[in-house]
């Protein structure tokens, strides 16, 4: 399910019939999310590094303040203000103090079949809703923001066969933490589980 779903999503976003692991494709992005951890860096690059800057489609952007709420220093407050002002100036959906960015995304934006870039490593959690989400850095986020596209390396898939029933008091979180403990924090980098 996971592997075929990711392949179908990437193929559709790339406008091709099929893709295979290891391929690199230019894709159209359905949504881009950034939080207060790095948005100020993207805004600085947009304002200071681009000639004739523009945003491809502001309706695809979501900015969420969730990492430092309330702000813990004047520097953080200034970064969040920069983010807030940029969102207002460009009519970008802006959320502040409404929850963790990924929960806001899951409850309000993520739809099955979408390809989503987020400036956060937990963006891959959107796979739980049948979307392809991946975390990117500021430069890739900015490129996606101004072009509406980016590149994607089609990930390999890792299949985990789980059998049996979880004992009482053991939950999905315990299961994934056990798997991560066994494979290591980097055990499935750029792979779909």
Where are the predicted features?
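Fe-S-dependent hydro-lyases/dehydratases of central metabolism
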Residues: 1-193
